[in-house]
A protein has these predicted regions:
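Beta-propeller-forming repeat regions
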Residues: 20-219
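Sec-dependent N-terminal signal peptides of Gram-positive bacterial secreted proteins and lipoproteins
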Residues: 3-25
Length: 219
């Protein structure tokens, strides 16, 4: 517990200095797909979604702002396509489609659904050390309500590994074990801020320690 507390303090300084999220820019991994070759099938599937009532709904904050983001989520050397849409007529309007390369085409692999009206931010990090990146999604329902949901890379409709309110968060490997730990700053019912330290243990994300802050933390 003492070790977790020390890591929490170290990580907190990194989080506060970094702004909303602490990430290492990988600009080559986040770009709009080329509209040629194997990307033609991806373009066709995206066009079908738009034709059927979906609209682009790119994240509005952070370093990953494209409506379609190309990134190798599973470490196999091929990029997956992560596409962000909104379908206002659905009970869960926010949609995150994941397409995987299959030979000379892209096939739909998973759809993440959210009840919020807006995706605030998205980040990708391997939190459990299995070589697959989890998807960290910041939802925003109003000017003062934010929720963080973390999804695994799994087929179908992935269920969140963790859902919580937050003001800021950071993911970084604080103890050198090859896994990304998670720091989340949030406010309680008395508007007092605290930072929670999460680590992957026994098949799930667990809150290891918590530190109350002397003042609230604005977004």
């Amino acid at each position: 517990m003492k070790r977790a507390g020390k890591l929490l303090v170290i990580g907190l300084f990194s989080l506060l200095l970094s702004g909303c999220m602490f990430t290492t820019p990988e600009t080559s991994l986040y770009r709009l797909p080329k509209l040629a070759g194997e990307y033609e099938s991806l373009e066709s599937q995206i066009d079908a979604l738009l034709t059927n009532g979906a609209e682009y709904a790119a994240p509005t904050s952070g370093s990953n702002l494209q409506s379609v983001q190309m990134i190798d989520l599973d470490g196999d050397g091929s990029e997956e396509a992560v596409a962000f849409f909104r379908r206002t007529s659905d009970k869960k309007p926010m949609k995150i489609y994941i397409f995987k390369a299959d030979g000379d085409s892209y096939e739909r692999y998973a759809v993440i659904e959210g009840a919020s009206s807006q995706i605030y931010s998205v980040n990708y990090a391997d939190l459990d050390g299995d070589g697959l990146k989890e998807i960290l999604v910041g939802y925003k329902s109003s000017s003062d309500v934010q929720g963080l949901a973390i999804y695994p890379l799994s087929p179908g409709t992935p269920e969140s590994l963790l859902t919580t309110g937050y003001s800021r968060y950071a993911n970084l490997d604080m103890n050198g074990d090859g896994k990304q730990e998670l720091l989340i700053i949030c406010s309680d019912e008395e508007s007092t801020a605290r930072v929670d330290y999460y680590d992957w243990d026994d098949g799930a994300l667990h809150a290891k320690s918590s530190l109350r802050l002397s003042a609230s933390v604005a977004e």
